[in-house]
Amino acid sequence: MVIIKLNANKNMPVLAVEKPQEIHKEELSDHHQSNGFTSLDLEMIELENFVLHCPLPEENLAG
């Protein structure tokens, strides 16, 4: 994929083409796919871990 910026900088030509940088998380996902996990699996596991570590609200907050 290529990102094209129009008039991003006055010193540059009208079209400036940039290659997006891959993020570290994608590299980790590719590494874990050999273990049978997809990137969606890893994101769901991360979300589940986040929810499990969230503090629960105290009961009867309204009254």
Swiss-Prot record:
Keywords: Crown gall tumor, Plasmid, Virulence. InterPro entries: VirE1. Pfam families: VirE1. The keyword Lyase does not apply. Disulfide bonds: none annotated. The keyword Lipid metabolism does not apply. One of its GO terms (biological process) is protein folding. Involved in DNA transformation; controls virE2 polymerization and prevents virE2 binding to DNA. NCBIfam families: PRK13867.1. The Ti plasmid contains at least six transcriptional units, designated vir loci, which are essential for efficient crown-gall tumorigenesis. Forms heterodimers with virE2 that prevent virE2 anarchic homopolymerization and binding to DNA. This is Protein virE1.
